């Protein structure tokens, strides 16, 4: 049964106004993000007492999309400072952990895939990195570690030379399919755990998973990320469909791993980042993101309508975690970066990504002109108006692109002086980090330092206490 918001939208006329957003004004961006958040929570059931199981969105949304949504909600809190919904987000992230604290709740076995489980683990990692208030009995990073351990135990070398299957259980359709979203999520989870804990076991697995994807052709030399292949044919033929979700999760994993590369002066991951960004061009039209595999033909399913949110995050991560120069709160100035040691200022990676995120944010805001209040978001951003669609994926994609235009925050990792890097989970997780923790500490806010383009960079803290940016 659809909730009140969706019923209202369906019965409403299309209004002429749209969501207002001024990308030079943080207050305006915050307001746009909050509007999208309110729509997300209305779909969840907040306000009409229809939340039956914490963390789960009603039909037609699958379990994985809850993980994506709560990840966005943690980011919303961290980037806007609005803690209004923190208790609700906290409850949702913990309610779905399952008996073994590994995001395998028994009531999800009918549909549980490796990509679904890891999507929730990535939300837990976001909570750890941003210093989201820790639960009493387990830390966010322990939840992520537990998922990592269950997934590497499923690494299947007997077919295709390795890789994760899409589905966990033999009775689920897709068990005989190895896809980029499942393996890309593993790359991302491993790379983020490596940077957070300092444990090289995780970075080794990130390398192993990405090399396997490259070896069988799921990641092409041109940076394309293809959907997957069947174990029935030993992955000899690929499904060449490209999705923003798979491209996005591999890119985010590469960006985090590139920070580790920097500490050894290696360029392997940074080179992959450059290649993946180039490969993501297929998802843009005049600097506006779109889902190339289904959007032009108007046949995106419920899951696919949320995929753009994952690529938006990845592009924002790439911009914010890969530059060794000062920037501004609104990300609206040309930033010189380095490509293989040569400084470039025109057409730089930063400029091209920033253009996509800013143009897409304006386009997304224009699409948010439906529903009773004239701010419900559609799925197609290239139309400059509402396309008549509505739902969780549309709101999450818009929310992420609005958040991508806010000042970034310093993330926590093994060498941070704030936050909660930990060494173990519930006794079965991988050891890592230096054991120091101050759980629940607030992350460093870089906003004041960068308003005038002076002083601090937007960075991921790493290494010997330095602000790390990768020169791409």
Regions found by a protein language model. Give the residues of each.
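Oxyanion-binding "anion nests"
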Residues: 249-285
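CBM-like carbohydrate-recognition segments
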Residues: 19-118, 127, 136, 178, ...
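Short coil/turn linking the two alpha-helices of tandem helical-hairpin repeats
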Residues: 77, 128-132, 194-198, 258-265, ...
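Extended ligand-binding groove/face enriched in aromatic
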Residues: 90-91, 95-190
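Cleavable N-terminal signal peptides of Sec/SRP-targeted secreted and luminal proteins
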Residues: 2-18, 460-467
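Active-site cradle of extracellular carbohydrate-active enzymes
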Residues: 183, 189-197, 201-257
């Amino acid at each position: 049964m659809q909730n009140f918001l969706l019923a209202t939208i369906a019965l409403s006329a299309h209004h002429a106004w749209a969501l207002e957003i001024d990308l030079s004004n943080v207050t305006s961006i915050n307001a746009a993000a909050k509007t999208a958040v309110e729509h997300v929570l209305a779909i969840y059931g907040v306000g009409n007492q229809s939340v039956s199981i914490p963390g789960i969105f009603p039909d037609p949304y699958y379990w994985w999309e809850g993980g994506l949504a709560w990840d966005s909600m943690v980011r919303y809190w961290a980037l806007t400072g609005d803690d209004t919904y923190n208790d609700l987000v906290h409850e949702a992230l913990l309610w779905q952990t399952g008996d073994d604290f590994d995001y395998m709740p028994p009531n999800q076995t009918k549909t549980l895939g490796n990509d679904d489980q890891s999507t929730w683990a990535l939300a837990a990692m976001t909570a750890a990195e941003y210093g989201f208030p820790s639960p009493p009995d387990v830390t966010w990073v322990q939840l992520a570690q537990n998922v990592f351990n269950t997934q590497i135990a499923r690494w299947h070398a007997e077919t295709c030379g390795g890789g994760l299957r899409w589905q966990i259980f033999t009775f689920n359709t897709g068990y005989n399919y190895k896809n980029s979203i499942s393996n890309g999520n593993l790359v991302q989870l491993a790379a983020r755990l490596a940077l957070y804990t300092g444990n090289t076991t995780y970075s080794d697995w990130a390398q192993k998973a990405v090399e396997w994807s490259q070896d069988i052709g799921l990641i092409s030399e041109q940076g394309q990320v293809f959907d997957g292949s069947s174990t029935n044919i030993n992955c000899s033929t690929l499904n060449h469909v490209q999705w923003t979700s798979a491209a996005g999760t591999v890119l985010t994993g590469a960006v985090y791993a590139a920070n580790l590369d920097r500490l050894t002066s290696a360029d392997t991951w940074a080179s992959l980042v450059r290649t993946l960004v180039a490969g993501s061009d297929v998802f843009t039209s005049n600097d506006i993101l779109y889902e190339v595999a289904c959007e032009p033909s108007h046949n995106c399913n419920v899951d696919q309508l949320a995929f753009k949110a994952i690529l938006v995050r990845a592009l924002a991560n790439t911009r914010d975690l890969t530059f060794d120069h000062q920037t501004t709160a609104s990300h609206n100035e040309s930033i010189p970066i380095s490509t293989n040691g040569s400084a470039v200022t025109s057409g730089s990676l930063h400029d091209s990504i920033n253009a996509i995120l800013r143009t897409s944010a304006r386009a997304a805001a224009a699409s948010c002109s439906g529903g009773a209040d004239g701010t419900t978001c559609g799925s197609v951003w290239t139309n400059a108006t509402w396309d008549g669609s509505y739902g969780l994926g549309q709101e999450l994609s818009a929310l992420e692109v609005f958040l991508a235009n806010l000042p970034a925050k310093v993330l926590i990792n093994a060498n941070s002086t704030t936050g909660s890097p930990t060494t173990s989970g519930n006794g079965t997780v991988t050891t890592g980090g230096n054991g120091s923790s101050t759980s629940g500490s607030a992350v460093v806010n870089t906003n004041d330092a960068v308003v005038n383009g002076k002083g601090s960079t937007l960075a991921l803290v790493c290494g010997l206490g330095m602000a790390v940016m990768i020169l791409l």
